[in-house]
């Protein structure tokens, strides 16, 4: 199954801006890989909460649409809230 996530490039980075994003219902994320510059992105929490429950989400290549440009990525790490059903941050790698 293929998954597509619509994202926007983040201009502010850091702990404070990430907290503001989470309070607004968004998830901060980063895409990195060898030979490429890291890209900080954000997307809606509702876009990720249901698809991350599927097992193949972690093993298949995903498509992230960053302001109209599609990028193939793979999930590297997910940080979740300690007791709430919330995703706090995701690390993607370029596929």
Swiss-Prot record:
Give me the disulphide-bonded residues.
Answer: none
Q: Which domain of life is it from?
A: Bacteria
Q: Which UniProt keywords apply?
A: Ribonucleoprotein, Ribosomal protein, RNA-binding, rRNA-binding
Cellular component (GO) terms are: cytosolic large ribosomal subunit
Please, one GO biological process term?
A: translation
UniProt cross-references to Gene3D superfamilies, sorted A to Z: Ribosomal Protein L25, Chain P
Protein task: This is one of the proteins that binds to the 5S RNA in the ribosome where it forms part of the central protuberance.
- Which family does the record claim for this protein? Belongs to the bacterial ribosomal protein bL25 family.
Name of protein: Large ribosomal subunit protein bL25
Tell me the organism: Shewanella frigidimarina (strain NCIMB 400)
């Amino acid at each position: 199954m293929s998954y597509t996530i619509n994202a926007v490039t983040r201009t502010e980075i850091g702990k404070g801006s990430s907290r503001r994003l989470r309070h607004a219902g968004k998830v901060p994320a980063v895409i990195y890989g060898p030979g490429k510059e890291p890209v900080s992105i954000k997307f809606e929490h509702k876009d990720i909460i249901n698809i991350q429950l599927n097992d193949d989400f972690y093993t298949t290549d995903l498509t992230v649409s960053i302001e109209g440009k599609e990028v193939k990525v793979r999930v590297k790490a997910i940080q979740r809230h300690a007791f709430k059903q919330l995703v706090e941050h995701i690390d993607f790698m370029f596929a």
